């Protein structure tokens, strides 16, 4: 692990969890060693790490390639374990090999070849996405599952909406556009007739190639109950600046057996969120223009 990698990870963790994350990060090598001795795996190199965790490659005692995921937020990790176990019958999420919420640790099988969906041939993707959704959505929501798509959107609109205070963003997206997205969202939520257990964060970076026998595998679920179209909307909106959202929407709706009108309506709801992300982190102007028109 290079110092630069750890510095970058440290900055992201501090951004998310506050200055205490630095002390936690310093203890990661010792924590990984303790868990390796307890669970019998061999620790490998640093794997890609997100804003809330550090991920290391490891080899399970039976030789299975695996990843060790560590987070200062044990409760968050426990929730992730629960969601992966709920979706396990679908065969379309990584298997949980071990977990300890108190230690903020879990070991998952590594998905191989593991190519992200955004790097797979675009022509076969709609069909494969359809197969993935069919498998995921066939899992019955647990009777007492507390998370709903409505709550997910309330949180997203509140959190992302704060960025409208940034002049660079308010110059492109006004309060009226944002309010229109909220109203469109309310209308779609009020007219949901089919409710399934959604992955809830199914963008092209959260779907990996599990090879010919397994198909596409979804990682990092934020499971909630709601309209099946929601698990295709990020993929559809990703058509902005390429073949176009409308064309991709038709293709994906057909391949996934979804209501094309509702899927397109959902894409208009999330379009301004994508614009804010592009303006914040950089994105093609052509896509921004198309998404602004979609949100109008």
Where are these regions (language model features)?
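A glycine-centered beta->alpha junction motif in the catalytic cores
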Residues: 61, 73, 89-90, 104-122, ...
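Juxta-kinase regulatory segment immediately upstream of eukaryotic protein kinase catalytic domains
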Residues: 1-44
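Active-site acidic catalytic loop and adjacent metal/ATP-binding pocket
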Residues: 47-48, 54-59, 67-68, 96, ...
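Active-site Asp-x-Gly
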Residues: 209-262
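Generic structural marker for isolated residues within well-ordered, non-membrane alpha-helices
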Residues: 10, 32, 84, 133, ...
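An alpha-helical support segment within catalytic cores of ATP-dependent transferases
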Residues: 24-35, 138-200, 210-212
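ATP/Mg2+ or Mg2+-diphosphate-binding catalytic cores
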Residues: 16-18, 166-168, 172, 247, ...
């Amino acid at each position: 692990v290079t110092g630069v990698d750890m510095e970058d990870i440290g900055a992201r963790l501090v951004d998310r969890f506050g200055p205490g994350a630095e002390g936690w990060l310093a203890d990661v090598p010792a924590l990984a060693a303790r868990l390796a001795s307890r669970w019998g795996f061999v620790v490998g190199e640093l794997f890609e790490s997100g804003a809330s965790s550090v991920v290391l490659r490891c080899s399970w005692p039976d030789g299975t390639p695996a990843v060790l995921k560590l987070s200062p937020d044990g409760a968050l990790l426990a929730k992730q374990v629960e969601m992966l176990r709920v979706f396990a019958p679908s065969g379309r999420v990584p298997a949980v090999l071990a977990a300890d919420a108190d230690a903020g640790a879990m070991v998952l099988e590594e998905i191989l070849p593991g190519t992200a969906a955004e790097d797979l041939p675009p022509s076969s993707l709609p069909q494969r996405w359809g197969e993935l959704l069919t498998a995921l959505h066939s899992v019955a929501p647990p009777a007492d599952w507390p998370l709903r798509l409505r709550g997910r959107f309330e949180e997203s609109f509140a959190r992302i909406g704060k960025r409208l205070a940034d002049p660079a963003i308010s110059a492109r997206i006004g309060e009226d556009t944002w309010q229109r997205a909220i109203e469109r969202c309310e209308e779609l939520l009020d007219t949901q007739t089919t409710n399934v257990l959604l992955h809830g964060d199914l963008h092209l970076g959260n779907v990996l190639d599990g090879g010919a026998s397994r198909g596409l595998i979804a990682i990092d679920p934020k499971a909630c109950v709601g309209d099946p179209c929601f698990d295709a909307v990020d993929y559809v909106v990703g058509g902005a600046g390429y073949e176009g959202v409308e064309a991709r929407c038709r293709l994906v709706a057909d391949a996934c057996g979804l209501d094309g009108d509702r899927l397109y309506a959902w894409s208009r709801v999330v379009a301004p969120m994508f614009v804010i992300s592009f303006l914040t982190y950089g994105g093609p102007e052509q896509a921004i223009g198309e998404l602004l028109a979609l949100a109008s």
